[in-house]
């Protein structure tokens, strides 16, 4: 796996925890945590080591248990992306920012636990669009949100057409804002 790591960035997990360190949405791509108990222990450890930091405006990076963890907080949600100790921090940070921004687009900038729980399917679709078996597929939030909105619309039919239009309009607005800054 070391040879693969040199050529293709790998993500070990993506965690979305609440302000108490409890799971909202998590996805593991590595066998480093073989049991559910070890996964929960890792989540608790990461949360306890990062919860006192101020990662609200920009992402922070730390090294925990031979893993690079990049993280960012918003409202009552804590976003984490974990990679190996030799992984490129900028790639992990791009994955984190893409996930955070895509979730913000899909939740219409209402990035809080209750809204996330009500739209958990969209969050898991974001994860699926971003990373597959640990390999980074996409980090552009507009692309991710657009694909998720289309998948969501296909799954639920005509009722979601309005949601798709709203998501695409929000994505367009976000893109325009990012081009102006």
From Swiss-Prot:
Keywords: Cytoplasm, Cytoplasmic vesicle, ER-Golgi transport, Golgi apparatus, Membrane, Protein transport, Transport. It is a peripheral membrane protein. GO terms for cellular component: COPI vesicle coat; cytosol; Golgi membrane; plasma membrane. It comes from the Eukaryota. SUPFAM superfamilies: SNARE-like. One of its GO terms (biological process) is retrograde vesicle-mediated transport, Golgi to endoplasmic reticulum. It is found in: Cytoplasm; Golgi apparatus membrane; Cytoplasmic vesicle, COPI-coated vesicle membrane. Belongs to the adaptor complexes small subunit family. The coatomer is a cytosolic protein complex that binds to dilysine motifs and reversibly associates with Golgi non-clathrin-coated vesicles, which further mediate biosynthetic protein transport from the ER, via the Golgi up to the trans Golgi network. Coatomer complex is required for budding from Golgi membranes, and is essential for the retrograde Golgi-to-ER transport of dilysine-tagged proteins. The zeta subunit may be involved in regulating the coat assembly and, hence, the rate of biosynthetic protein transport due to its association-dissociation properties with the coatomer complex. Oligomeric complex that consists of at least the alpha, beta, beta', gamma, delta, epsilon and zeta subunits. PANTHER family: COATOMER SUBUNIT ZETA-3, ZETA-COAT PROTEIN. This is Coatomer subunit zeta-3. It comes from Arabidopsis thaliana.
